[in-house]
From Swiss-Prot:
UniProt xrefs under Pfam families: SDF
HAMAP family attached to this UniProt entry: Ser_Thr_transp_SstT (MF_01582)
Sorted UniProt keywords: Amino-acid transport, Cell inner membrane, Cell membrane, Membrane, Symport, Transmembrane, Transmembrane helix, Transport
Function according to Swiss-Prot or TrEMBL: Involved in the import of serine and threonine into the cell, with the concomitant import of sodium (symport system).
Record field: catalytic activity: L-serine(in) + Na(+)(in) = L-serine(out) + Na(+)(out); L-threonine(in) + Na(+)(in) = L-threonine(out) + Na(+)(out)
Membrane topology per record: Multi-pass membrane protein
Subcellular location: Cell inner membrane
One GO-annotated biological process of the protein: serine transport
Record-given protein name: Serine/threonine transporter SstT
Intrachain disulfide bonds: none
Gene Ontology, cellular component aspect: plasma membrane
Annotated gene: sstT
Length: 414
């Protein structure tokens, strides 16, 4: 009897609503951090294991899915990568432009000290682009070990095209391997409530939010701008694409993808989650198996906002005058920097000195701005990743649904 009850409970947990279970884990994590700080720090291991498992499986998932989809691609079957890529770039630039408007409407100032982070940022945009190009010719084993998704994509696409000329047995083997890795991903994702419980507990216990109050205005501007992009700018772009109410799709992506990304704070770790959501939305597998890992690399609306807002906060603090053409140029520079953020250790924060260089701000002061970014990183990085990752699915779904409707309309006319 006890065994039957236990198996019934496990079955309900395995088949229950993952979002509801995550909310329970979130509440329990907050309560544990409030009741016992040492215990909360100890259960942080659960969160570390969960994020580690996602990061471990994501590179293999991308390699196998992309390779399988291209190897088994039928001649004449169309994918929607080009419109998705256009949406990625347009969305990132729109986010940078929104951040400029927000920063001028609600100017922030920083408390800059004489000390700076002992970190060497990229010296220019050319170096960032060079790093991206070099990552394309990375050794495949090295790319998998270091989660270099540009390198993984290049090898997966190349091997996929090569395997098109292979026999059906080989293609079936690759497809079976892809399905096996997908099953492993689903298994890992079921542990999300436990992982988020550990992440929330340890974060509140070790950092807390007391240090964030000194930067409340800056955080409000940053997060407010990200909310504007998530709830206004992105829906407008999706409406332009699908010509109907975009909000059901927007909220589904924020709920199913953004929540995970907020707590894991890793676009790479969220790739399996996004892949599962694309499958749930019944999108074309040949399309999303390429667009999702590509989006995790270049679709960086949140990074563009972070770079723009923190740069203009430094500009306002130092009293540097900014005209409209310079502000527009900053949007372009921030967009380019954001697209290269995944190839830089430290991500968007370490690309701030590139944008600061436009205004003649010395490197030591620019690195102090980076230090401010690290202080508010608990919330900034979480919100940035949630926006970046949920937008990957949103734009992929919008492009796929728009193409499906176009084909359906053409069929009706004929």
């Amino acid at each position: 009897m006890a065994t039957q009850r236990a198996s019934g409970l496990l079955q309900r947990l395995a088949q229950g609503s993952l979002v509801k279970q995550i909310l329970v884990g979130l509440v329990l994590g907050i309560l544990l951090a409030w009741i016992s700080k040492p215990a909360a720090e100890a259960v942080g291991l659960l969160g570390t294991l969960f994020v580690g498992a996602l990061k471990a499986v994501a590179p293999v998932l991308v390699l196998m899915l992309v390779m399988a989809s291209i190897a088994n691609h039928q001649h004449g079957q169309k994918t929607n990568i080009r419109p998705i890529l256009f949406l990625y770039l347009l969305g990132t630039f729109s986010a940078a432009l929104a951040a400029v408007v927000f920063s001028f409407a609600f100017p922030s100032t920083l408390h800059l000290s004489s000390s700076a982070q002992d970190i060497v940022p990229p010296s220019g945009i050319v170096e960032v682009l060079r790093g991206l190009l070099m990552s394309m010719v990375s050794n495949p084993i090295d790319a998998l070990l270091n989660a270099n998704y540009i390198g993984i994509l290049v090898w997966a696409v190349s091997l996929g095209f090569a395997l098109r000329h292979g026999n059906e047995t080989t293609k079936n083997l690759v497809n079976d391997m892809s399905n096996a890795v997908t099953f492993m991903v689903k298994l890992v994702i079921r542990f999300a409530p436990i992982g988020i419980f550990g992440l929330v507990s340890s974060t509140l216990a070790t950092t807390g939010f007391s240090t964030l109050w000194g930067y409340a205005h800056l955080l409000v501007v940053l997060i407010g701008c990200m909310l504007l992009v998530a709830l206004v700018v992105n829906p407008l772009l999706v409406f332009w694409k699908i010509r109907r109410n975009p909000y059901p799709l927007v909220f589904a992506c924020l709920r199913e993808s953004g929540v995970y990304a907020f707590f894991t704070r890793s676009s790479a770790a969220n790739i399996p989650v996004n892949m599962a959501l694309c499958e749930k939305l019944n999108l074309d597998r040949d399309t999303y198996s390429v667009s999702i890992p590509l989006g995790a690399t270049i679709n960086m609306a949140g990074a563009a906002i972070t770079i723009t807002v923190l740069t203009l906060a430094a500009v306002h603090t130092l009293g540097v005058p900014v005209d409209l053409p310079t502000a527009l140029l900053l949007s372009v520079v921030a967009s380019l920097c954001a697209c290269g953020a995944s190839g830089v250790a430290g991500g968007s924060l370490l690309l701030i000195p590139l944008a600061c260089n436009m205004f003649g701000i010395p490197n030591d002061i620019a690195m102090q701005v980076v230090a401010v970014g690290f202080i508010i990183g608990v919330l900034q990085d979480s919100c940035e990743t949630a926006l970046n990752s949920s937008t990957d699915v949103l734009f992929t779904a919008a492009a796929c649904q728009a193409e499906d409707e176009r084909l359906a309309n053409n069929a009706l006319r004929s």
